[in-house]
C-alpha cells in the first residue's frame, strides 16, 4: 500500500509499506477487534490470526522435545531455538559476534537478571535511573548496596555524565533509563549509552548502561548495528511487538558479559558439572552468555512461536519503519484533535501531558502514546475511573492510572513524595478508584497506538470525548429536569415493587404482592446476605465481570425455610436447582447437612470481610459450572455485621448543582454537618442498607434514550434502542406516582429533593442518604445477562454531577425507628407493595 487520501488530506504515511489497506488487514487478521476500539498497545499489541494458525501448523507438523535431551525431537527444538535467537538479533540489527540474546519471561525478568548479577559482584554496585523509568527499573535500586540516585531531568543525567571523568575503576555503576516513556511516549536520547561508555573508559571507570526498550520497540525499529554506541544491556518484551508469544529478551553486549561471572545462582542447563555429596562444586557453561543465564528448560514452544511472529509481522507490515510512520501519523492526528477540543465557554477539555521538547512529527523525540486527563467547563477534573467505565460500555479500551511509571506520573500531576505518602495514609492505592485527591488527579488516561490501529479508532475516540465530555451551551438546559411544585394532596407516591437480592450481584427475588416484608437496620430481610467468592482469590464475584450472574435467581421460601436457587434463562426447560437453609443452625435438610461452612476472608468493595463459605463440593459445582469460574457460596449473617455504610452525604454539592437550573431560593443554606455522622450497618451491599428508584425517573430516562437513538439515526430494531427495565438498577424499592386527577404529569428525579420518607399505615420512616453512583453494571439485562450500552450512555449525558454518574437514592431506617426497634424486640418493621410513600423535601421546614 503506497498511501491513501481521505477528506482531501494526503496521508502517505498511513499504512505505507503495508501488504494491504489497514482496514483489510484488520478485518482478516484481527477478528477480535470487531466492534472494538483498542488503544492499549503499550500494554500489549494484538496477535494476528495467521500467526496463531502458522504456529498451530508448526506444532502439529513437528515433534518438539525438551532441548536438554539428545533425542531427535529434542535436537529439532534446539536447532529451532538457535535459529530464532539469531533471527531476533538480526531483527534489531545486532551482530551475533558482538551481542548475545537471552530469552526471559519479560522485560522485568531481564532487568532483574542484570541487577541480580551486579548485586552478586564482590563490591556491589551503585545504581542510577531516570525519573521516567518504569517501576521495574526503579525496583532495581533495592539491590544497589553502594547507593542509588534518581535523575529528575535530562540535564541532571548529562551533568552526571560529565562527572564520569572523575570516577575510579573501583566503582561498579549501572545507569538505566527507558528508550521511550511508557507514560506519554516521550523518547530519551539513545546517544547517552555511547557517551557514558566513552567517558567511563577514558577515566578507567566501570560504568554500564541498561536500556529499557520495551515501550520503544512496540512501534519503532531499534538499531544495534553500532556495537560501540549500543547499550551494554537491552531489555524488551516480544508481546509488545507481536502480541504473541508472551516472551522477553535480554540483549547483552558481549564485552559486558563478564558482569555475570559472579552470578551465584545456577539452574538446570547452565552448568557442565555439579558435585553435591563429598564436596560442593560446579562448573558453569562457558560456550555462550545465554548458556550460562537461561536457567532450566527454556519455554521452547514460545520461542518457536516467535519464528511465526517474525514472519507474520514482516508479511503484513513490511518493516518496523513502516509501523513507525503509520503510528506517528495517527498519533499526531489524535493529539491535534484532542488538543483542539474546547467547551462552549472556551475552556480546554483535555489536559495533555507532554515533554516540552517532544514533537509528534518527529520519531526521535516522540512515540505514539498520548497521556491526558479531562476537565469540565469549570475546570474541575473528571475522574479517570468514570471515563474508563463509560469507555468500556462503548467498547473502547485504553489504560488509566499511574501506568507503572511513578516518577513520570507524579511529575506530570504535580505530586511530591510527601504528598503521595500523605495520600497513601489516606487510602490511595495503585489501581483503586481514588481519582481526585486534594484537587489533583491521581492518575492519567493513556491512549497508545499499534501497527493495526486505523483512522476509525482515532475518530471513535474523538467522537467519544466530544459526545460525553465536551459541554455545549445548548445541551445544559436538559441536564436536570426542573422539579415541579409539590401538590397539597397526599399521598402522591406508593411502593410499586419490592426486591430482595439474597445473593450479592445475582438475580432479584420479587416480594409478592400482599406480602409484608421485614426491614432491618441492615436493609430488607435476607437482602445481600450471601455472595459468591472466587475459590482462588477470595474476591467476591460481581456482574461486571460475570454477567451471567444475573441468571442466578434466588427464591426466599419462608414456608419451607430455604433459599431456593435456580440457574439459567427463565424460558429454559433444564434449569438447575439448589436449596440451602435460611437458618444457620438448621442441619435437618439433606441439602444443607453437607454444606459445612468455614470462615474465609473475602474482599467486598475494597473491604476485607469474613464470610462463612459453603465447603460442599455440590454447592461449588452448582455455581462454578454455570459461571465457568471456580467459586462457591458464602454467607455474611446480620449478627456478625462489621461493615458500615459511609455517613450520610452532605447534600450541598448536589444542591449547588441544581441551583443553576431551578428558581432561586428553592433551597435553604446548608446546615453544618454533625461532628460524628451516623453510619449504618450493612451486609454485602455496596454503600447503604436500601436502594430506591422512581418509576417516573425510569420513564423519563427511557424517553431520553429513545430521543438519543433517533438523533443518531440508528437502525430500527437494534438492541441498543430498546427501553431499559427498572430491574437494571437493582433497587430494593421502586416508588411510583399515584395520580388522582388529570393530566397525568410525572415528576422525574423529584427524589433528588427527598430528605426522608414515611411509608405505610404505621408511617415507617426512612432517611434518604444521598445519590447512588452508577457503573456499567446497569447495562446488563437482568433477564438475559446480555450487556448493552444503555442506560449508562444516556445517564452519562443527563445525570452527571462532579464527574459521577448517579441514578436513584440510598436510604436507611431512620435512627428513631432503630432506637424504637431495639427497645421493643417483639415489634418488627415491615413494608408491602402498595404502601403509600410520603416524602419530606429538602426545602421544607
UniProtKB/Swiss-Prot annotation:
Top-level taxon in the UniProt lineage: Eukaryota
In terms of HAMAP family, this protein maps to: MOCOS
**EC?**
2.8.1.9
This protein's species is Aspergillus clavatus (strain ATCC 1007 / CBS 513.65 / DSM 816 / NCTC 3887 / NRRL 1 / QM 1276 / 107)
Cofactor(s) recorded for this entry are: pyridoxal 5'-phosphate
Q: Name one GO biological process term.
A: Mo-molybdopterin cofactor biosynthetic process
User: Where in this protein does the record say N6-(pyridoxal phosphate)lysine is found?
Assistant: 240
Protein name, entry field: Molybdenum cofactor sulfurase
Name of the gene this protein is made from: hxB
**InterPro entries attached to this UniProt entry:** Aminotrans_V_dom, MoCF_Sase_C, MoCo_sulfurase, MOCOS_middle, PyrdxlP-dep_Trfase, PyrdxlP-dep_Trfase_major, PyrdxlP-dep_Trfase_small
Q: What class of enzyme is it?
A: transferase
Pfam families named in the record: Aminotran_5, MOSC, MOSC_N
* Pathway recorded for this protein: Cofactor biosynthesis; molybdopterin biosynthesis
Describe the reaction catalysed, as an equation: Mo-molybdopterin + L-cysteine + AH2 = thio-Mo-molybdopterin + L-alanine + A + H2O
GO MF: lyase activity; molybdenum cofactor sulfurtransferase activity; molybdenum ion binding; pyridoxal phosphate binding
Q: Which UniProt keywords apply?
A: Molybdenum cofactor biosynthesis, Pyridoxal phosphate, Transferase
Q: Which family does it belong to?
A: Belongs to the class-V pyridoxal-phosphate-dependent aminotransferase family. MOCOS subfamily.
Active-site residue list: 404
- Known role: Sulfurates the molybdenum cofactor. Sulfation of molybdenum is essential for xanthine dehydrogenase (XDH) and aldehyde oxidase (ADO) enzymes in which molybdenum cofactor is liganded by 1 oxygen and 1 sulfur atom in active form.
All copies of domain MOSC, residue ranges: 666-840
Amino acid at each position: 500500500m503506497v498511501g491513501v487520501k481521505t477528506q482531501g488530506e494526503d496521508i502517505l504515511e498511513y499504512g505505507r509499506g503495508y501488504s494491504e489497506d489497514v482496514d483489510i488487514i484488520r478485518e482478516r487478521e484481527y477478528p477480535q477487534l470487531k466492534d472494538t476500539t483498542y488503544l492499549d498497545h503499550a500494554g500489549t499489541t494484538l496477535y494476528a490470526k495467521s500467526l496463531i494458525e502458522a504456529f498451530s501448523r508448526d506444532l502439529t507438523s513437528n515433534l518438539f522435545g525438551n532441548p536438554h535431551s539428545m533425542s531427535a525431537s529434542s535436537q529439532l527444538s534446539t536447532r529451532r531455538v538457535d535459529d530464532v535467537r539469531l533471527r531476533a538479533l538480526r531483527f534489531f540489527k545486532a551482530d551475533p559476534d558482538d551481542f548475545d540474546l537471552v530469552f526471559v519471561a519479560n522485560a522485568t525478568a531481564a532487568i532483574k537478571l542484570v541487577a541480580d548479577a551486579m548485586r552478586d559482584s564482590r563490591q556491589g554496585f551503585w545504581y542510577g535511573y531516570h525519573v521516567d523509568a518504569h517501576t521495574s527499573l526503579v525496583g532495581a535500586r533495592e539491590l544497589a548496596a553502594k547507593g542509588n540516585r534518581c535523575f529528575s531531568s535530562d540535564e541532571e543525567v548529562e551533568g552526571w555524565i560529565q562527572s564520569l571523568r572523575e570516577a575510579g575503576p573501583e566503582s561498579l555503576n549501572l545507569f538505566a533509563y527507558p528508550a521511550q516513556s511508557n507514560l506519554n511516549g516521550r523518547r530519551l536520547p539513545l546517544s547517552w549509552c555511547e557517551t557514558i561508555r566513552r567517558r567511563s573508559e577514558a577515566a578507567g571507570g566501570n560504568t554500564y548502561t541498561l536500556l529499557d526498550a520495551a515501550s520503544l520497540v512496540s512501534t519503532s525499529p531499534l538499531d544495534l548495528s553500532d556495537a560501540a554506541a549500543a547499550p551494554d544491556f537491552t531489555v524488551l518484551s516480544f508481546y509488545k511487538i507481536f502480541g504473541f508469544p508472551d516472551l522477553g529478551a535480554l540483549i547483552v553486549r558481549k564485552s559486558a558479559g563478564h558482569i555475570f561471572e559472579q552470578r551465584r545462582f545456577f539452574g538446570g542447563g547452565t552448568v557442565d558439572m555439579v558435585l553435591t555429596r563429598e564436596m560442593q562444586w560446579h562448573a558453569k557453561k562457558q560456550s555462550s552468555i545465554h548458556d550460562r543465564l537461561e536457567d532450566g528448560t527454556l519455554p521452547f514452544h514460545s520461542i518457536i512461536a516467535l519464528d511465526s511472529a517474525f514472519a507474520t509481522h514482516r508479511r503484513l507490515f513490511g518493516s518496523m519503519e513502516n509501523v513507525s510512520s503509520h503510528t506517528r501519523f495517527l498519533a499526531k492526528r489524535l493529539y491535534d484533535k484532542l488538543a483542539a477540543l474546547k467547551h462552549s465557554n472556551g475552556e480546554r477539555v483535555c489536559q495533555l501531558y507532554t515533554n516540552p521538547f517532544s514533537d509528534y512529527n518527529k520519531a526521535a523525540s516522540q512515540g505514539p502514546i498520548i497521556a491526558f486527563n479531562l476537565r469540565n467547563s469549570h475546570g474541575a477534573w473528571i475522574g479517570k475511573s468514570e471515563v474508563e467505565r463509560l469507555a468500556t460500555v462503548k467498547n473502547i479500551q485504553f489504560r488509566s492510572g499511574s501506568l507503572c511509571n511513578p516518577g513520570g506520573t507524579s511529575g506530570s500531576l504535580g505530586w511530591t513524595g510527601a504528598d503521595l505518602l500523605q495520600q497513601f495514609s489516606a487510602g490511595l492505592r495503585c489501581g483503586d478508584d481514588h481519582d481526585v485527591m486534594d484537587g489533583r488527579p491521581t492518575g492519567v488516561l493513556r491512549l497508545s497506538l499499534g501497527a493495526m490501529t486505523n483512522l476509525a479508532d482515532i475518530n471513535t475516540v474523538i467522537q467519544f470525548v466530544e459526545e460525553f465530555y465536551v459541554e455545549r451551551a445548548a445541551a445544559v438546559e436538559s441536564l436536570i429536569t426542573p422539579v415541579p411544585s409539590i401538590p397539597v394532596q397526599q399521598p402522591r407516591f406508593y411502593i410499586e415493587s419490592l426486591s430482595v437480592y439474597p445473593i450479592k450481584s445475582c438475580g432479584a427475588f420479587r416480594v409478592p404482592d400482599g406480602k409484608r416484608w421485614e426491614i432491618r437496620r441492615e436493609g430488607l430481610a435476607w437482602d445481600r446476605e450471601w455472595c459468591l467468592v472466587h475459590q482462588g482469590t477470595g474476591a467476591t464475584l460481581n456482574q461486571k465481570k460475570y454477567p451471567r450472574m444475573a441468571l442466578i435467581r434466588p427464591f426466599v421460601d419462608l414456608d419451607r425455610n430455604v433459599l431456593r436457587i435456580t440457574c439459567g434463562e427463565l424460558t429454559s426447560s433444564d434449569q438447575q436447582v439448589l436449596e440451602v437453609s435460611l437458618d444457620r443452625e438448621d442441619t435437618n435438610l439433606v441439602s444443607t447437612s453437607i454444606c459445612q461452612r468455614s470462615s474465609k476472608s473475602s474482599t467486598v468493595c475494597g473491604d476485607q470481610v469474613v464470610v462463612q463459605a459453603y465447603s460442599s463440593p455440590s454447592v461449588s459445582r452448582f455455581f462454578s459450572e454455570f459461571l465457568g469460574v471456580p467459586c462457591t457460596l458464602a454467607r455474611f449473617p446480620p449478627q456478625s455485621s462489621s461493615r458500615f455504610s459511609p455517613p450520610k452525604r452532605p447534600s450541598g454539592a448536589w444542591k449547588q448543582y441544581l441551583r443553576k437550573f431551578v428558581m432561586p431560593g428553592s433551597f435553604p443554606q446548608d446546615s453544618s454537618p454533625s461532628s460524628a455522622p451516623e453510619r449504618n450497618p450493612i451486609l454485602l451491599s455496596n454503600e447503604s442498607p436500601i436502594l430506591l428508584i422512581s418509576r417516573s425517573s425510569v420513564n423519563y430516562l427511557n424517553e431520553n434514550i429513545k430521543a438519543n437513538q433517533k438523533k443518531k439515526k440508528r437502525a430500527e430494531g437494534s438492541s441498543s434502542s430498546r427501553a431499559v427495565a427498572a430491574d437494571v438498577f437493582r433497587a430494593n424499592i421502586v416508588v411510583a406516582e399515584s395520580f388522582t386527577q388529570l393530566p397525568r404529569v410525572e415528576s422525574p428525579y423529584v427524589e433528588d429533593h427527598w430528605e426522608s420518607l414515611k411509608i405505610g399505615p404505621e408511617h415507617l420512616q426512612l432517611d434518604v442518604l444521598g445519590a447512588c453512583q452508577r457503573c456499567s453494571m446497569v447495562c446488563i439485562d437482568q433477564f438475559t445477562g446480555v450487556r448493552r450500552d444503555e442506560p449508562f450512555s444516556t445517564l452519562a449525558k443527563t445525570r452527571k454531577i462532579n464527574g459521577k454518574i448517579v441514578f436513584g437514592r440510598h436510604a436507611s431506617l431512620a435512627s428513631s425507628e432503630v432506637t424504637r426497634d431495639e427497645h421493643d424486640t417483639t415489634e418488627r418493621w415491615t413494608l408491602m407493595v402498595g404502601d403509600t410513600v410520603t416524602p419530606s423535601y429538602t426545602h421544607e421546614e
